[in-house]
Amino acid sequence: MDYLLNYADQYALDSIYNAVYPLARDNIVRQSISLFFLTWFGGMFLYLTFASLSYQFVFDKSLMDHPKFLKNQVFMEVLTALQNLPGMALLTVPWFLAELHGYSYLYDNISDYGLKYFLCSLPLFVMFSDFGIYWAHRFLHHRYVYPRLHKLHHKWIICTPYASHAFKSADGFLQSLPYHLFPFFFPLHKLTYLALFTFVNFWSIMIHDGKYISNNPIINGAAHHNGHHIYFNYNYGQFTTLFDRLGNSFRAPDEAWFDKDLRQNEDVLRVELMEYEAIRNEVEGDDDREYIANSAKKNH
């Protein structure tokens, strides 16, 4: 993060602070303010850019005809994300500050730990994050925690890419915590850290994009995560299915999801919706969602 902050200082922030309220670059108040806005606007840029590209070119828009797609859902997803990104940025600032002040194992040169470790650190990051997110996500589904923190994200049953960041600030922060913890336990190249931070944002969008290409037994793809949103209590992992398998929470995607015609079959949908309603009622009780199908019926 120091690379990004230095560039921002050099090309924009020095001039802004000098004009508004002069503070030295190493002033912790200035650093905190700068990191907050960089994280907020950077996160917003990544979210709106990647989610919009995915929505335009990848997302299967026939899913918007699903009976559990919500009225004004895309607008609500974007609004929810934009309302909560500042809070997520605020919660993230202390971690970036700690990294900036040398409390992490972030390093500058690949030669510091060697090429072999550098290459090994990439899958290590993925597995560490996947393990941490699995347990954070499972914690968020605890019956006392779910209605207070995570229920908002499960408002979206049939997701669009914009649902990827549409959750409460504390929810998003808890699920991102393993990313920030990693460099405090293991050495990680600084530029790689920034690249991985971008990658995890992209991955979050990808597993919400509704493009059910692969039923890979190892990789947690969009179909697996769709199963999580429909059936609630399965597939908590982010990148792989490993920890769901070990934690007995893995559920293979429904085969019908990989066949566009079969996916829209009334009999297939009836079975899917019966199970969805049973699980949703157990997890949430009364349903306060306004589905587009119900709205259309009211208008006729």
Swiss-Prot record:
It is an enzyme of class 1 (oxidoreductase). InterPro entries: Fatty_acid_hydroxylase, Sterol_Desaturase_Related. It is found in: Endoplasmic reticulum membrane. Residues 123-248 form the Fatty acid hydroxylase domain. GO terms for molecular function: C-5 sterol desaturase activity; delta7-sterol 5(6)-desaturase activity; iron ion binding. A motif (Histidine box-3) lies at residues 225-229. Disruption phenotype: Abolishes the production of ergosterol when erg32 is also deleted. The double disruptant also leads to susceptibility to cycloheximide and to staurosporine, but does not affect tolerance to nystatin and to amphotericin B. The chain crosses the membrane at residues 33-53, 78-98, 117-137, 180-200. A motif (Histidine box-2) lies at residues 150-154. This is Delta(7)-sterol 5(6)-desaturase erg31. The gene is erg31.
